[in-house]
Amino acid sequence: MPFRDLILFNLSKFLLTEDEESLEIVSSLCRGFEISYDDLITYFPDRKYHKYISKVFEHVDLSEELSMEFHDTTLRDLVYLRLYKYSKCIRPCYKLGDNLKGIVVIKDRNIYIREANDDLIEYLLKEYTPQIYTYSNERVPITGSKLILCGFSQVTFMAYTTSHITTNKKVDVLVSKKCIDELVDPINYQILQNLFDKGSGTINKILRKIFYSVTGGQTP
């Protein structure tokens, strides 16, 4: 594994989270491989990072022993950093009244309803006639489905990124520990790939490069 990737990964982590352990690792690697301040800012040209990068060379405590390999948790750390301070919300649809409550999952012509009040059921029967759609007691997979949320203020990142959500009130997209655990599951590799490919900005581009280096893929 190129030592520069280790430096860039830990420096990105420090710049995002101010993690002191990452700062110590970067400082130690830079001293050991004679990496200068000018070398680092070529990867981080944005001036807002420069005062933090200077701390790398002001740091006194250095690690006596350093691993030249990424840890087993690196992929999870990459996802955490990519979604660090993630902020997204879903705007309400004017067609859905404030009086509607419940969850509806629509996949093809199958409809699964949960915790719905009478107003929501009445709305569904008008919009999705039983002559065409099948109302089922069995859960319908969320992935690739249309999700109608009424009366909720939050939705998980996994639900947001794998389905088309319509809501009757503003909904915040939540990134949780469980969500990150699900994302690093090999079955969700395509979701991860899309997540890193869509990233813009200096640090996101570096995280994308390291993501493909760690997973063995080819950077687009």
Curated annotation (Swiss-Prot):
Induction (record text): Expressed in the early phase of the viral replicative cycle.
Pfam families in alphabetical order: Chordopox_G2 (PF05796)
Entry-linked InterPro entries: Chordopox_G2 (IPR008446)
Keywords carried by this UniProt record: Early protein, Elongation factor, Protein biosynthesis
Cysteine disulfide links: none
Family the entry assigns: Belongs to the orthopoxvirus OPG087 family.
Subunit structure of this chain's protein: Interacts with H5 and A18. Might be part of a transcription complex composed at least of OPG087/G2, OPG145/A18, and OPG110/H5.
Function noted in UniProt: Involved in postreplicative transcription elongation on intermediate and late genes.
Protein name: Late transcription elongation factor OPG087
The encoding gene: OPG087
